[in-house]
Amino acid sequence: MMNQWTLPDYVEDMLPDEAVYLESLRRSILDLYQAHGYFYVIPPMLEYIESLNSNGQDMDLDTFKVVDQLSGRLMGVRADITPQVARIDAHLIHNEEVTRLSYAGSVLRTKPASFLQSREPFQIGAELYGFKGIEADLEIQTLLIKTLNTIGIKTPVFDFNHLDIFTSLIASSNIERDLLDRLYEAMQKKDQSEVKSLTQSLDKKNREALIALVSLYGDVNILKEAEKVLPQDKAIKNALQFLNQIDKALKASDIKISYDLSDIRGYQYHNGLVFSVYADQCYS
């Protein structure tokens, strides 16, 4: 017989010591963001599903769905706060100039990102809107480095990609939605044989480029390799040049830098530079 107090898998209580520690970090990080001009917003836990997925279906499978008892419409529990903050900037703030927003809160996902992670992770971050160019990206990178220092993470590894590379390839290939979803999964798994199988109907140039993306990860030398094997498309050339500029700008920082051109998470609602951060003190 199941214990009535048993929690679902990958969901847990946070006891006093952990809760106090998390709250201390939350306050320190939000104070840091406020000092740099980022205004705090609190999006709702629930939204209509079409609003949560208005910029793409990237998080659809991770989203818990319920029927609104008032309207009968399908609602979702947020699995990521980032699209919500983008919605707030686009539809509520109406600022034609630069907007800096910060956020913090729990999200809920149908499955954990790994067997070591919770399905109810706490998400905190800052978003910069209306300011394009390398200066904007460097501002966010610098703020993130300060955030990591605030929570005691030293010598992190920054893993960069520029989504214009992938989106340029698929835009000129006219790939159907279902195939694109399967290609995305194969890219995330770095399953080169599956990418080869899925792209058989594409023209030779783009097919070879998509297959090559899977193996294009490593240090800055990967960018030189990418220049050789990827099409001489203007958007791709600009993206690789941008990544080279980021590398030069951040070399003075106490971080390690790597690149993964097949890491296309969020490509449906993000554009430009994207990155992940890894540290010995964290799982991911």
Regions found by a protein language model. Give the residues of each.
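Auxiliary tRNA-acceptor-end handling modules of aminoacyl-tRNA synthetases
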Residues: M1-E18
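Positively charged, Gly/Ser-enriched RNA/tRNA-binding surfaces
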Residues: E18-H36, E47-E50, G72, T82-N95, ...
